[in-house]
Amino acid sequence: MRTAEIREKFLSFFEGKGHLRLPSFSLIPEDDPSLLFTSAGMAPLKPYFLGAKPIFGGREWRRVTTCQECLRVGDIENVGRTSRHNTYFEMLGNFSFGDYFKKEAILWAWEFLTEHLRLDPGRLWVTVFEDDDEAYEIWRDLVGVPEERIGRFGEDENYWPGGAITHGPNGPSGPCSEIFYDRGPAYGTPDETGPNTGSGDRFVEIWNLVFTQYDRQGPIPGPGILKPLPQKNIDTGMGLYRVAAILQDVEDFYRTDTFFPIIQEVARMSGRPYEGKTSVSHRVIADHVRAVVAALSDGATFSNTGRGYVIRRLLRRALRHGYLLGLSDPFLHRLAPLVAELLGDFYPEMRENLPAVEKQIRLEEERFLETLEGGLKRLDALLSGLKPGEVLPGKEAFRLYDTYGFPLDLTVEIAAERGYGVDTEGFQKAMEEQQSRSRAAMAFEREIFKKGAQVLEELYAERGATEFLGYNALEAEAEVLALLAGDQSLLEAGPGTEVQVVLDKTPFYAEGGGQIGDFGLLEWPGGRARVETTRKTERGIFLHKARVEEGVLRVGERVRAVVDPRRRDTERNHTATHLLHAALRAVLGPHVRQAGSLVAPDRLRFDFTHPEPLKPEELERVELLVNRWIMADFPVTWRYMPLEEARKEGAMALFGEKYGEVVRVVRVEGSPLEGLESKELCGGCHVRRTGEIGAFLIRSEEAVSAGVRRIEAVTGEEAIRFARGSLNRLKALAERLEVGEAALEERLEKLLAELKEKEREVESLKARLVQAALGGGGGASLEEKGGLRWTVAELPGLDAKALRQAADDLVARGADVALVLSGGQAVLKLSPKAQGMGLEAGALFRALAEKAGGRGGGKGALAQGGGLDPRKAREALPGLLP
């Protein structure tokens, strides 16, 4: 049974049980900074497990089913080395928000597996939490699973989150029941007698049913108290690829129909069959290219931090394994269309965004292969500093791996060719230290249900989300509902206290969509607090970070909330950002997509997908288009509409962003260019007419990462100040060069030409100095040993470039081995004849350094370094020649 058929059978089955089928949510979590990527099927549905009403399509649905794409990188080093680990996977799930519970979840799971997938009931085993008698009895009495195939386990195996009772976290939790498939003795080990025993792969977990019925409270770590939840939920997860491997009767998911075509293509491209030791590299490439294509298709971009660093690491690991297969040129981008072909029917964004994704991957590959070349040079330098028989330290091998992406096995192979060993134990220790740091930093998966302050939960249950008034007003009267300081809820806050203030309604915009959070004042009789920024919770409760300056602020106080008037500048910049986006697409093409933004009062920053720097004329056209929009003074309107209607009208959505059923569409009613319009889904603050922006000037354009560019610009008074400052600097420069501003460019070109001429004269003088020194001897007489002519020359005052030139000249004059010294520097050059007699510059220099002090290295005909004692070097060199 093909993977696509299994996926459809599952979703159709639960639709028949009254579930709403939802499309997969983005891999990029929406409004959940605790997650780098969507890592579980339930992650996007977290608010509904915590009590939010599950409204979809205008009605409430208590039953939902999904096939969710997920990405996890916690065990990345095991990917490819085992048949159980992968990064990008699809999780089938059925969910109940306070509707059905254990009985239905268990009976439906059994029905689907045995009647619809036709799995042999005799090969299905189940496990339950040791204290969950209810689940045990359902399996035994209602389903009919024999007692010997029902295992009872503790909180580490059959409670979610694992170990939560003893170790936390606090919050919703519950027992779980897992379903395993017995693949037979051929897949196992003698000690494997059932699920969670032994070390083999005989018993494969295919489905986990989580019964979220308790609120865990208490010390962490320490024995927790399990309080029954008012709303009991069901959260299940079935690994699509594990089930596919069973139904397709293949040994692991790498041979299923969504993986194996990629592995076959890698084998074809490399000429290395999928077998033996190299099969690890085939699997790594197949897994990682799927993950990279999926993440980029959902809006991620390569970077040095956060999720961008994760996908960069995946791409580089795949490239390293390609290198081991002999693929030394960019090749991953050529696999992207195959990934889109295999997965694009269910994830259409992969096909829609394929051209941009291919381009990003190609650029990132080219950049990294240059880095890999740097790793080769670094490894050569490290090995050159070792004595014969020495071992490369593990920390250095790991630094090569971590900085240059240089795989350990490649380091071992190259070192062995040169006669050196590698401290692999030290490498593993350094790796484990980094993984420990990584696990500590990325403990978010365990905290997926981490609870906010109880007061916020109670406020939301009682009043709902904060009412936002800021689209139409910068001031409002409001009531203080709560004061929070850290984890504490306060009744009042005095002068100097920093608190998070919750109001019943607010004109303050909460940070989001690239726009910074509003700042300003809260005023009340006898008191004042300064709001530094504003954010909001997942549930839409606005948190005003404020410091009390005068008086005492109390819960229940009526305050006047006043947004700083600079918000108007923020509005100018936000509308200008929309115009910039449209202008970039008009000038550069429809491949341009927003990849990030910052909208502040004093500037705007816009990141967008484009493979190369903008030409000056392109920047000029973009800037002119935006200013024509401004001068036309078109109205700016916004209205709410269903998401599908907005898409049909052509409203631009953020690349990879997921939206609710009803969205706000911001539109500029007019255009300076036929066929060009600005219409975007946006919750931010905007001017009422484009003329309010005043003016728009681009300050800079630069690269952010491979395939992503950044423009910074200013509007309004900031644009005037920027223009005036630029003119003043131009005038000052012209005065300093004693020319008129109109003649400034001509004067600079003349100065640059004169500078180049002087540089040529300096180089000529250096060459003459070298010739004079050599002609004057410099100790550079030629001597002979074993048919090789050698010389040592001391030439004071030369830089490294001149030293190399001197060595070249000596070889051209007949020397086979030329050592040139200047101050603390040294260059060694060999003739083809010397190389033909078995000499290698790096090895000869290291041998010389052992006798004359100093360090250095090289390869082939050239080596360089420093610290050699000239007298000792002159005495030692002939003894090192054949």
UniProtKB/Swiss-Prot annotation:
Enzyme class: ligase
Encoding gene, per UniProt annotation: alaS
Assigned keywords, A-Z: Aminoacyl-tRNA synthetase, ATP-binding, Cytoplasm, Ligase, Metal-binding, Nucleotide-binding, Protein biosynthesis, RNA-binding, tRNA-binding, Zinc
Source organism (scientific name): Thermus thermophilus (strain ATCC BAA-163 / DSM 7039 / HB27)
GO cellular component: cytosol
Keyword Phosphoprotein: no
Compartment annotation: Cytoplasm
Job description of the protein: Catalyzes the attachment of alanine to tRNA(Ala) in a two-step reaction: alanine is first activated by ATP to form Ala-AMP and then transferred to the acceptor end of tRNA(Ala). Also edits incorrectly charged Ser-tRNA(Ala) and Gly-tRNA(Ala) via its editing domain.
Domain notes: Consists of three domains; the N-terminal catalytic domain, the editing domain and the C-terminal C-Ala domain. The editing domain removes incorrectly charged amino acids, while the C-Ala domain, along with tRNA(Ala), serves as a bridge to cooperatively bring together the editing and aminoacylation centers thus stimulating deacylation of misacylated tRNAs.
Annotated protein name in UniProt: Alanine--tRNA ligase
Known catalytic reactions: tRNA(Ala) + L-alanine + ATP = L-alanyl-tRNA(Ala) + AMP + diphosphate
